[in-house]
């Protein structure tokens, strides 16, 4: 699914009206019907009172139409229309006239805000501003937003929380942005929803399809995407019944050091649970017996040292190589890693300590073989990219670095971003907070390694891996909850995740 800028969404709306054709008021009616159905499904029939706050623009028009439809559905509602300049958009004005024919009370707020008395079982519908807002809320709008945020009520935002910008908020005052519990967004997610700083505004958000023209959507170009299940399922071929293990690649995992065998085991198990035909693990002598006992399906080879990697393994036999989980940063390991990168001619995955070593000389990334992937968490990427901190800055830097080095970058976190060498960014839609646990990244490395070994290109491997990793995490969270979730639980859930995708 494409993610669009605000102006592009306006153009898609306009093109939809032209292509169907459909009048703007009728398109608004369709959107309002979809929103109302979602609201009634979640909150209707429970003696709830709906307090609807509408602005003077088209988002307010949606809210007024919702008020009318809630009355038709037998729900009790009241409207507060904020119109300090007595100037409504044409469609908002039309929906006001339609609402006046109903029994729903309407309060017009001018330049002064008078706080209404709302009942305790109140559902607030926020329809003050849409995604087109390009400046901070002020005046009576800001007063109303602060009032809404102070209410002991469930807050539902239409399309986007009022005061939140569709792309970036800059220095917007958080007090003047609605803190929604639920956001019902239309057709596409907004880029701002995917930024950590905005989670407190959007709450749990859901995408509602309002039937915008597929032709209009196709015409608009974007380098931003939100990955959904159907897209990933379409990328997974059925296994040939005449195939053998050699058809699914031979993966090499370089991992582990004294006291860090667990990282190698998690990555190895994830590799085998993700379809690699063969797996060899280069690990120090101290971990050899542990690994062969824990992962009997894997082969091991010496890493040239008792406690850590000292000698880079030859890579000619393998279809992909991953290095980093539990590797350590000893001087001999650093030297061996740099030699391994120099010698390797197949796609590589770099994670964890491999990235910590590379951070000392980030230009080494330019030496990685074509089709390689790195998987930094925000702290690791900050070290690689010279200290960039905000998610927006990291995404921009990762996009630039991926293009410069012709690699794929998996920028881990909520809505993990896959930054491809062609400048696209794919945000993941699976995963949960319970996955913020030791070894979770090692598990992801194993999944990526398996997919590269099986012959997927770097972008496809990264997109599939983060989706499956998150899906397995969601399955594990269903079984065990967020607090108790471990990386081993994620590995154990991988068969279920793959099975879901194979249906």
What does each model-identified segment do?
Residues 1-83, 89, 182, 193-348, ...:
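Small-residue (G/A/S/T)-rich helix-start motifs and N-terminal tracts that mark the onset
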Residues 121-123, 128-222:
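Internal gly/pro-rich beta-alpha loop/helix module
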Residues 111-114, 160-166, 191, 306-308, ...:
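Short acidic loop-to-helix transition motifs that present clustered carboxylates
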Residues 91, 136-138, 169-170, 385-389:
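Short, solvent-exposed loop/turn segments at secondary-structure boundaries
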Residues 103, 150-153, 404-407:
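A structural motif corresponding to the C-terminal end of an alpha-helix
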Residues 65-149, 289-303, 310-313, 317:
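N-terminal small/polar loop signature for handling phosphorylated ligands or for N-terminal nucleophile
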């Amino acid at each position: 699914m494409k993610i669009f800028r605000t102006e592009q969404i306006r153009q898609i709306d306009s093109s939809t009206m032209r292509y169907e054709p459909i009048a703007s008021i009728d398109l608004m009616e369709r959107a309002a019907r979809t929103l109302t159905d979602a609201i009634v499904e979640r909150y209707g029939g429970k003696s709830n009172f709906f307090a609807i706050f509408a602005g003077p623009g088209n988002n307010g028009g949606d809210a007024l139409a919702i008020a009318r439809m809630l009355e038709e559905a037998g729900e009790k509602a009241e409207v507060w229309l904020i119109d300090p300049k007595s100037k409504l958009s044409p469609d908002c004005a039309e929906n006001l006239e339609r609402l006046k024919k109903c029994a729903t009370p309407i309060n017009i707020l001018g330049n002064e805000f008078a706080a209404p008395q709302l009942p305790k079982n109140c559902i607030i519908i926020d329809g003050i501003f849409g995604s087109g807002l390009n400046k901070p809320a002020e005046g009576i709008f800001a007063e109303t937003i602060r009032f809404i945020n102070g209410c002991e009520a469930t807050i539902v935002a239409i399309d986007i929380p009022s005061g939140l910008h569709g792309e970036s908020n800059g220095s917007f005052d958080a007090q003047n942005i609605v803190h929604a519990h639920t956001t019902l967004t239309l057709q596409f997610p907004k880029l701002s929803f995917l930024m950590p700083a905005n989670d407190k505004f959007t709450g749990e958000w859901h995408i509602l399809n309002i039937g915008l023209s597929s032709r209009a959507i196709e015409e608009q170009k974007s380098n931003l995407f939100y990955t959904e299940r159907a897209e990933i399922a379409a990328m997974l071929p059925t296994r040939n019944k005449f195939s053998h293990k050699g058809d699914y690649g031979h993966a090499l995992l370089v991992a582990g050091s004294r006291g860090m065998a667990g990282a190698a085991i998690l990555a190895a198990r994830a590799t085998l649970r993700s379809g690699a035909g063969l797996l060899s693990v280069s690990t120090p002598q101290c971990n050899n017996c542990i690994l062969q006992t824990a992962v009997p399906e894997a082969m091991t080879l010496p890493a040239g040292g008792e406690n850590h990697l000292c000698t880079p393994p030859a890579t000619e036999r393998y279809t992909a190589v991953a290095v980093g989980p539990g590797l350590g940063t000893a001087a001999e390991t650093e030297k061996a890693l740099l030699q391994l990168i120099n010698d390797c001619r197949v796609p590589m995955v770099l994670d964890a300590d491999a990235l910590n070593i590379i951070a000392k000389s980030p230009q080494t990334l330019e030496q990685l073989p074509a089709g390689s992937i790195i998987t930094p968490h925000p702290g690791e990427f900050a070290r690689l990219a010279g200290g960039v901190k905000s998610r927006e800055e990291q995404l921009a830097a990762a996009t630039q670095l991926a293009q410069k080095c012709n690699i794929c970058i998996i920028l881990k976190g909520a809505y993990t971003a896959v930054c491809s060498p062609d400048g696209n960014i794919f945000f993941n839609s699976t995963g949960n907070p319970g996955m913020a646990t030791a070894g979770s990244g090692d598990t992801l490395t194993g999944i990526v390694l398996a997919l590269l070994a099986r012959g997927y290109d770097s972008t496809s491997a990264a997109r599939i891996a983060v989706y499956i990793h998150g899906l397995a995490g969601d399955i594990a969270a269903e079984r065990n909850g967020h607090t108790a979730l471990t990386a081993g639980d994620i590995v154990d859930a991988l068969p279920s995740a793959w099975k879901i995708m194979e249906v």
